[in-house]
Every structure is written in structure tokens, then in C-alpha cells.
């Protein structure tokens, strides 16, 4: 049985509030909206009206979830600490809020046996209304010709200072006709800005200038920047230097 948009919001309210306190945001959408813009090879294998939820992390996640997680939990040495924190936080909130629901969770880093990602994160961000996915197709006369340029999502309040973390699918929840799709905010409006965005993301991504393509209400703290600028293989040493990991967790 399909549920109304009001019931969707009621279902997600406590979950939304719990994750917000940890520095995450959620954006619900129908599986059919996602499948409609992709080839069959990338479809999510659920009925079109099935409720899905995209989870993103905001700058607050680092201080509100990640650092407390490091203080209270043992990090597995072979897994990325941020990924562990995200999985731990989502698992706890799902268990608390959806004890009687079947929720399938896919993380942004997970791959299928075919080596395709479990879901296309930026497409999900766009169809859910979380962030506009800017691609070469959004530019009338690309100055780089046939050169491959990857697209990037921009959040209307956070610019590029966020990350897509997970996709939840509520296997037995169908959203009704009243649950309408919301277009993402087109906050990079001019062709010149879009060109600058894609060039910054593809050619100068290390300087992070693409993240400031629009004014952001919040940005990563200096400590968070230092963590993400550090090469992945050296981040555990940095966490030990900060006092968050013991030698047995290295």
C-alpha cells in the first residue's frame, strides 16, 4: 500500500533528527525517479514507487560524529575510519528508528561483483533534490572540446563542502502519487560559472576551489581539511598524532 507524502515525512522524522545531530542530512526519493535517468545496467532492482533515501555528510559530521566515534569505538585497521564511522552511525540510527522495517543500505564506496558501483551517488543526489549534478551536458559550447570532464554536485547551502555517503531503500514502503519530486537548486547559473566549476573540479581538484563555487553556510574546519588533504595511507598516523588511535589500532 502506498503512503502519502505526509506519512513519508512522519516515517523519516526521528531518523532525520537523529542524523542531523551527527552532521548528516537525508533526502527521500522514489526509486523510479533514479531509474528513469539511467540505463537498465544501473537500475535499482525495486518497484518504481519504492521509497529510497540519500544520506550526505555535512561539515559538522567530522566534529559531531567522527571524532567522538574515534574516542569511543575501536577502529578496524583494514577499513577507512570515516567509512567505519558512517556505517556505525547509520546502523545505530536505523536500528533505533526502523526496527520493524526492511532497509537495504548501500555505501558510496561499495561495488557490485561487476565492479560497477552499487549506486551512482551524484545521480541520486540530483534526483533526490539534494544537490545539482553539473555535467558537460549543462554547458552549451564546452571549451575543452571532446576531452572527458567529470561532473560534480553542488549543494545550495554547502557548495562543495559535503560528501555523499549512503543510499537506503525501504523495501516494503511505497510512496504514493502525492510524494512529488523536488528539483535540485540550480545555484551555478551562468555558463561561465559552470565552465569554471568543471575545470576546477577536473584540473585543479587538489586546491578545493570548486567547493567554493557558491557561498557556503558552513565549511570544513582546519582540522577536517588537514585530515582529508592527508593521503589515505597516512591518515591513521595523523589520527595517532592527534591522540585518537592507539598503536594496537594502527
From Swiss-Prot:
<keyword id="KW-0597">Phosphoprotein</keyword>
<dbReference type="GO" id="GO:0009235">
    <property type="term" value="P:cobalamin metabolic process"/>
</dbReference>
<keyword id="KW-0274">FAD</keyword>
<keyword id="KW-0963">Cytoplasm</keyword>
<dbReference type="GO" id="GO:0071949">
    <property type="term" value="F:FAD binding"/>
</dbReference>
<keyword id="KW-0560">Oxidoreductase</keyword>
<feature type="binding site">
    <location>
        <position position="153"/>
    </location>
    <ligand>
        <name>substrate</name>
    </ligand>
</feature>
<dbReference type="GO" id="GO:0005829">
    <property type="term" value="C:cytosol"/>
</dbReference>
<dbReference type="Pfam" id="PF16690">
    <property type="entry name" value="MMACHC"/>
</dbReference>
<keyword id="KW-0170">Cobalt</keyword>
<dbReference type="GO" id="GO:0005737">
    <property type="term" value="C:cytoplasm"/>
</dbReference>
<dbReference type="GO" id="GO:0031419">
    <property type="term" value="F:cobalamin binding"/>
</dbReference>
<feature type="binding site">
    <location>
        <position position="164"/>
    </location>
    <ligand>
        <name>substrate</name>
    </ligand>
</feature>
<keyword id="KW-0285">Flavoprotein</keyword>
<dbReference type="InterPro" id="IPR032037">
    <property type="entry name" value="MMACHC"/>
</dbReference>
<dbReference type="GO" id="GO:0033787">
    <property type="term" value="F:cyanocobalamin reductase (cyanide-eliminating) (NADP+) activity"/>
</dbReference>
<keyword id="KW-0288">FMN</keyword>
<dbReference type="GO" id="GO:0032451">
    <property type="term" value="F:demethylase activity"/>
</dbReference>
<dbReference type="GO" id="GO:0061181">
    <property type="term" value="P:regulation of chondrocyte development"/>
</dbReference>
<keyword id="KW-0846">Cobalamin</keyword>
<comment type="similarity">
    <text>Belongs to the MMACHC family.</text>
</comment>
<comment type="function">
    <text>Cobalamin (vitamin B12) cytosolic chaperone that catalyzes the reductive decyanation of cyanocob(III)alamin (cyanocobalamin, CNCbl) to yield cob(II)alamin and cyanide, using FAD or FMN as cofactors and NADPH as cosubstrate. Cyanocobalamin constitutes the inactive form of vitamin B12 introduced from the diet, and is converted into the active cofactors methylcobalamin (MeCbl) involved in methionine biosynthesis, and 5'-deoxyadenosylcobalamin (AdoCbl) involved in the TCA cycle.</text>
</comment>
<feature type="binding site">
    <location>
        <position position="108"/>
    </location>
    <ligand>
        <name>substrate</name>
    </ligand>
</feature>
<comment type="subunit">
    <text>Monomer in the absence of bound substrate. Homodimer; dimerization is triggered by binding to FMN or adenosylcobalamin. Heterodimer with MMADHC.</text>
</comment>
<dbReference type="GO" id="GO:0016740">
    <property type="term" value="F:transferase activity"/>
</dbReference>
<feature type="binding site">
    <location>
        <begin position="119"/>
        <end position="122"/>
    </location>
    <ligand>
        <name>substrate</name>
    </ligand>
</feature>
<keyword id="KW-0808">Transferase</keyword>
<dbReference type="GO" id="GO:0048703">
    <property type="term" value="P:embryonic viscerocranium morphogenesis"/>
</dbReference>
<protein>
    <recommendedName>
        <fullName>Cyanocobalamin reductase / alkylcobalamin dealkylase</fullName>
        <ecNumber>2.5.1.151</ecNumber>
        <ecNumber>1.16.1.6</ecNumber>
    </recommendedName>
</protein>
<feature type="binding site">
    <location>
        <begin position="133"/>
        <end position="135"/>
    </location>
    <ligand>
        <name>substrate</name>
    </ligand>
</feature>
<keyword id="KW-0521">NADP</keyword>
